[in-house]
Amino acid sequence: MRLLTLLGLLCGSVATPLGPKWPEPVFGRLASPGFPGEYANDQERRWTLTAPPGYRLRLYFTHFDLELSHLCEYDFVKLSSGAKVLATLCGQESTDTERAPGKDTFYSLGSSLDITFRSDYSNEKPFTGFEAFYAAEDIDECQVAPGEAPTCDHHCHNHLGGFYCSCRAGYVLHRNKRTCSALCSGQVFTQRSGELSSPEYPRPYPKLSSCTYSISLEEGFSVILDFVESFDVETHPETLCPYDFLKIQTDREEHGPFCGKTLPHRIETKSNTVTITFVTDESGDHTGWKIHYTSTAQPCPYPMAPPNGHVSPVQAKYILKDSFSIFCETGYELLQGHLPLKSFTAVCQKDGSWDRPMPACSIVDCGPPDDLPSGRVEYITGPGVTTYKAVIQYSCEETFYTMKVNDGKYVCEADGFWTSSKGEKSLPVCEPVCGLSARTTGGRIYGGQKAKPGDFPWQVLILGGTTAAGALLYDNWVLTAAHAVYEQKHDASALDIRMGTLKRLSPHYTQAWSEAVFIHEGYTHDAGFDNDIALIKLNNKVVINSNITPICLPRKEAESFMRTDDIGTASGWGLTQRGFLARNLMYVDIPIVDHQKCTAAYEKPPYPRGSVTANMLCAGLESGGKDSCRGDSGGALVFLDSETERWFVGGIVSWGSMNCGEAGQYGVYTKVINYIPWIENIISDF
């Protein structure tokens, strides 16, 4: 609230030719005649003060000294606003029956204030009268006394000289500028059940509002209305709903109007569309109504679940648009005729029939199990039984294959897949047994011996640009020397790979073809033999038998079997002492040579490129005569693991003296244990 005097002073200091025109300030001083001297007898003076519309007058006294009389009958100051007397004042201090202004401030009820001063014909003492000051100030119309109706329905905003009203969201200001009417028309309900109510329910509903609600369901439904909780709409004892009313209209009939405090009865409309109209006038304080609506329709036949199945959801009845699904017990699947279904849901139609026939729940059949390469399958539950919970047992061909990872037991599960005890759906793997040989070693050193069938079943003959050797890994990889297949690294199909034979020129052998050649990335051709190792991937897996068996890769503990003077065995069809390629597979048992001793042997001429590295190991006799030679390149230097009783590849024939078996020189082999990560990565990636 601001004093108009202050506004007047402010407006006077700023030139605003285009701005709003403020009212002239209203303020001033009033005093009794002769003030500050004593006032005379038989005096009457009247002042009428007027403020602009929207303002009121404020008046207070700075001095007041009048004759005191009973009920201020003699001398007094009377304050009036319109027809109402605000106060009659006399004396200097208030008593039980008389009032003096003291420090009170007086306000006009409107924009005018009348002040009347009167003295009677005699005063026993001299009285000095009064001095008062007045000013116009803005009326805050938004403030109302307790018990009075608010100025605005929702929000009241005071401003100088007036006020205005505004409404909350969802309401609009009525043309009377005070009432907030609800925006409640055009609401459409399309769900099969729901609730609707008067605005603000259960608080008093707004005045001067017209609400329209529509329930619109699909044809075939019938709407049912239930009034719930409470019903309170303004009524009249003699006239039917003259003020506020509720009406319900369908395409068949009209219900209502409704008003009063009694809940209307249930209304079964027999219609799929309903319009509800609610109209209020400008008065009253009533809480309104609430309706819960439902719908019904012609029911469909009650669904009976098939054997080994159940219906969901279970309802007392199913009407239009209601649906149910069929779920089969674990181990059973939905079938419509002979066609499997991922799910089944039927919907009730408006004519009371289901849109789909009932399916069957048939036991899951996993079908005949897949054949296991290098293995067999046995039906445990019963001959040819492949239905839910049936058990089969896979096993690998004995001696030459062993099952990898799981135990081979598979069960037909509810998803229709044969599944292992570890949850695997893929077939088990029959992995070739490695390191089997018909030969045993007693540790004697001897050489140039012919191999017998089954002695070196991992031996591979590689024919390409030259004759070389290799060793079978698993059933589709060959380990060899990089220099032996370097020329064919981009033409793998040019390699002729033979295995399962002892005689180099025999027509009886197992043929294999190369799919890809992998040379170690650290190998540099014609620049020494460091990293002289390669892998050949075969087009197809070979069948493992007594004559074709893979060699084992070394375990971490394998170096304990490859110390100095430990015996390894090299085999191949390389040059013999007579200078010709051997017709029969030959082998030689040779000891491991101290690494420093071997390194020193190749530091002397004529071996400018003969550098022995940590990736190599040496074997042979200091006296010579026992060695691998040209044509043996890529073959395996193998050792017997006495703990597993399996043979493993410790070295790959790489290089040596220009004259094979030369005294003081040794055969140099790629140290396979240094390349286990490289070998495993290549095999797993390809």
UniProtKB/Swiss-Prot annotation:
Pfam families in the record: CUB (PF00431), EGF_CA (PF07645), Sushi (PF00084), Trypsin (PF00089)
Chain residues that bind Ca(2+) 1: E67, D75, D120, S122, N123
Gene Ontology CC, one term: extracellular exosome
GO biological process: complement activation, classical pathway; complement activation, lectin pathway; proteolysis
Domain CUB: 16-137, 184-296
Keywords assigned by UniProt, alphabetized: Autocatalytic cleavage, Calcium, Complement pathway, Disease variant, Disulfide bond, EGF-like domain, Hydrolase, Hydroxylation, Immunity, Innate immunity, Metal-binding, Protease, Repeat, Secreted, Serine protease, Signal, Sushi
Subcellular location, record wording: Secreted
EC number in record: 3.4.21.104
Site (Cleavage): R444, I445
Tissue: Plasma.
InterPro entries named among the record's database cross-references: CUB_dom, EGF-like_Ca-bd_dom, EGF-like_dom, EGF-type_Asp/Asn_hydroxyl_site, EGF_Ca-bd_CS, NOTCH1_EGF-like, Pept_S1A_C1r/C1S/mannan-bd, Peptidase_S1_PA
All residue ranges annotated as the EGF-like domain in the record: 138-181
GO terms, molecular function: calcium ion binding; calcium-dependent protein binding; complement component C4b binding; identical protein binding; peptidase activity; serine-type endopeptidase activity
Post-translational modifications reported in the UniProt record: The iron and 2-oxoglutarate dependent 3-hydroxylation of aspartate and asparagine is (R) stereospecific within EGF domains.
Residues where (3R)-3-hydroxyasparagine is found: N158
Boundaries of every Peptidase S1 domain copy: 445-684
Sequence positions that bind Ca(2+) 2: D138, I139, E141, N158, H159, G162
Gene3D superfamilies: Complement Module, domain 1, Laminin, Spermadhesin, CUB domain, Trypsin-like serine proteases
Signal peptide residue numbers: 1-15
PANTHER family documented for this protein: COMPLEMENT COMPONENT 1, S SUBCOMPONENT-RELATED, MANNAN-BINDING LECTIN SERINE PROTEASE 2
Family, as annotated: Belongs to the peptidase S1 family.
Function: Serum protease that plays an important role in the activation of the complement system via mannose-binding lectin. After activation by auto-catalytic cleavage it cleaves C2 and C4, leading to their activation and to the formation of C3 convertase.
Protein name: Mannan-binding lectin serine protease 2
Organism for this UniProt entry: Homo sapiens (Human)
